[in-house]
Amino acid sequence: MMTNGTGRAGTVRRGAGALAAVLATTLLAGCGPAGTDSGSGGTASTSPSANPKQALLAAVPDGSEGAFRFSGKDATSDLSGVVDPAAKGIDLTAAVKDPEHGFTTRMSFLVVQERIWMKVKFTGTDGLTGLPKLPNRWMELDRSRLTDPDATPTYEGVDVGNAGPIIQAATTVEEKADRTYAGVVDLTAAEAAKAVGEEEVAALGDAARQVPFTAVVGADGNLTSLTLDVPAAGTAKAWTYVVKYADYGSAPKLAAPGGDAAQPAPKLAYQMLNG
């Protein structure tokens, strides 16, 4: 039991389980734009295209660009990591601060093919006792030992930020001369709602049909950022959905950790994930 005098039992377990679910679902829904190629990483144009929407979709990563970095945030979380299409791998990290006790849980997952490893680190723990003591190495997980195997990440494609389905749901797209795009997205479209979060979209009501966005394409023709400015709705404050892609072809390649860098996950790791 973790406590600082007023603590609640199970805080870390609940937090770790929720964080794992966030890492597996937020910005990693594995959606694909309906009825269109999600992109080919083509050469950027210096003048507006005849079809800005299709030009923007063509900039969405499709796996031909090599390994690249990504980061993103939505209403509740921030993620960052690397995607390596050749390895069918992702390396992603998120950090969540406990609002009651003040410590931060930093959780990382590494997926290569069908295998998955996890790391957990706690910071800001002065004065706290009972935090789980886990190895500093990558801990390989057996999905069959998880209560919900789908709550941990899997490799489901390169567009981890779901830029494709969001852009596909755009009702207007305007291309600027500096490779910046602006427009409006109808988030009630099925795949777009899944990408951003169906509960969050439902809370917007009619405003979900008119959500402004901006996007930037790099000189190499690849998407570098997509930002949705989600309006306030009811008691919910306005928030932004941001996806950033960078270092196409130059990010580190992913591989299964070997030797002393990894070990089988201990029982305590499964207790954290299973809640």
Residue ranges, per PLM feature:
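Subset-of-secretome marker
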Residues: 3, 32-275
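Bacterial N-terminal signal peptides that target proteins for export
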Residues: 2-19
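Short hydrophobic/aromatic segments of transmembrane alpha-helices and their interfaces
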Residues: 19-20, 206
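C-terminal motif of bacterial Sec signal peptides marking the signal peptidase cleavage site
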Residues: 26-30
